[in-house]
Amino acid sequence: MDKNIDFRMRVLVADDFATMRKIVRNILKQIGFDNIVEAEDGQAALQVLKNENIGLVVTDWNMPNMNGLELLEKIRTDPKTAKLPVLMVTAEGLKENVVAAVKAGVNNYVVKPFTAEVLQEKIEQIFKKLAG
């Protein structure tokens, strides 16, 4: 695993499906993250971001109340969270969706279904790039 990653950081997993949150949580634990918090939609994720020190956000695109793209836009416009790494994990694999997420400032993008190895690699890519 990448030496650029501090596994003590708190990771926020935002997805409206509890099963998907559990899958992502289990993969994150396999990778080495133990400090994981969950949110069922973008609004709940914003509350977590307001109250907790988060080091990485893993978010779905399609969620009620506030989708992952709207969450990403709010993260990028708040000076407190503007530089926070965000990984979008979603079924939205159409080129225009990927482009919209990139334009909004996503750090990396994973299309469902995915493997633990793909999620790990995408996270490693984020932190390698951030390390320069």
Please report, for each region that a protein language model flagged, where it lies by residue.
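Two-component/phosphorelay signaling modules centered on CheY-like receiver
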Residues: 18-37
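Alpha4 helix (beta4-alpha4-beta5 surface) of REC/receiver domains from two-component response regulators
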Residues: 25-26, 70, 93-108
